[in-house]
């Protein structure tokens, strides 16, 4: 059984909106509904768990009607806490693999879901990633130090793992930027799956405007 964990518990404070960004509506759908729709259509996914804050349960329940949705789980104050809540909820389902995705990355393609899961079956863990094409610098005391671009990737989601591996990675708590970090500390090789620029995360208002433009054509994009 392959289960997608859709993280939708963030506060979206950098967006400066009264509503968390995952619940902002673009082209008739809330942001979280875009990746959710991809999971529901994907033949590679058997079930979906949506993680959000208790005060948004009713909103999610009204928007979600599908047999693939296994449940709505209360998230924590941090990303890692939310992932652990989902893993605990999933114990009774005994999934083989779980796929973790940020709801603020609305434009998820089915081919990426399938490929990340395929690579995770080979190594135990895989993530969507994008080669960096920009110049990178580290700034300290107003001095710029240039970072070589070769071998530098942006880590995206979705990320897929053996359920047992991800559960073990989180069993001692901890706070992580994403889930590949604690998994790699177990000595597990993380497979990288090439993504594309559409996998961006909506963080600022400018991102939301770009998302509106893409959403108008999303159903036509293969």
From Swiss-Prot:
One of its GO terms (biological process) is isopentenyl diphosphate biosynthetic process, methylerythritol 4-phosphate pathway. GO terms for cellular component: cytosol. It catalyses: 2-C-methyl-D-erythritol 4-phosphate + CTP + H(+) = 4-CDP-2-C-methyl-D-erythritol + diphosphate. Pathway: Isoprenoid biosynthesis; isopentenyl diphosphate biosynthesis via DXP pathway; isopentenyl diphosphate from 1-deoxy-D-xylulose 5-phosphate: step 2/6. The record marks 14, 21 as: Transition state stabilizer. GO terms for molecular function: 2-C-methyl-D-erythritol 4-phosphate cytidylyltransferase activity. It comes from the Bacteria. The keyword Ligase does not apply. Gene3D superfamilies: Spore Coat Polysaccharide Biosynthesis Protein SpsA, Chain A. InterPro entries: IspD (IPR001228), IspD/TarI (IPR034683), ISPD_synthase_CS (IPR018294), Nucleotide-diphossugar_trans (IPR029044). Keywords: Isoprene biosynthesis, Nucleotidyltransferase, Transferase. Its EC number is 2.7.7.60. The record marks 149, 201 as: Positions MEP for the nucleophilic attack. Catalyzes the formation of 4-diphosphocytidyl-2-C-methyl-D-erythritol from CTP and 2-C-methyl-D-erythritol 4-phosphate (MEP). PANTHER family: D-RIBITOL-5-PHOSPHATE CYTIDYLYLTRANSFERASE. Belongs to the IspD/TarI cytidylyltransferase family. IspD subfamily. This is 2-C-methyl-D-erythritol 4-phosphate cytidylyltransferase. The gene is ispD.
């Amino acid at each position: 059984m392959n289960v997608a964990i859709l993280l939708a518990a963030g506060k979206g404070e950098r967006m400066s909106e009264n509503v968390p960004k995952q619940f902002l509506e673009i082209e008739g759908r809330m942001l979280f509904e875009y990746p959710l729709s991809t999971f529901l259509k994907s033949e590679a996914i058997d079930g979906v768990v949506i993680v959000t804050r208790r005060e948004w349960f009713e909103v999610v329940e009204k928007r979600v009607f599908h047999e693939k949705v296994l449940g709505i789980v209360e998230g924590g104050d941090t990303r890692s806490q939310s992932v652990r809540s989902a893993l605990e909820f999933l114990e009774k389902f005994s999934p083989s693999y779980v796929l973790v995705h940020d709801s603020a990355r609305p434009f998820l393609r089915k081919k990426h879901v399938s490929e990340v899961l395929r690579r995770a079956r080979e190594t135990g863990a895989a993530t969507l990633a994008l080669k960096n094409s920009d110049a990178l610098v580290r700034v300290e005391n107003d001095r710029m130090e240039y970072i070589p671009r070769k071998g530098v990737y942006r880590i995206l989601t979705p990320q897929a793992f053996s359920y047992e591996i991800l559960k073990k990675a989180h069993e001692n708590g901890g706070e992580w930027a994403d889930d590949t970090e604690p998994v790699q500390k177990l000595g597990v090789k993380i497979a990288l799956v090439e993504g594309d620029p559409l996998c961006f995360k909506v963080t600022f208002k400018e991102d939301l405007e770009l998302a509106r433009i893409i959403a108008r054509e999303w159903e036509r994009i293969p």
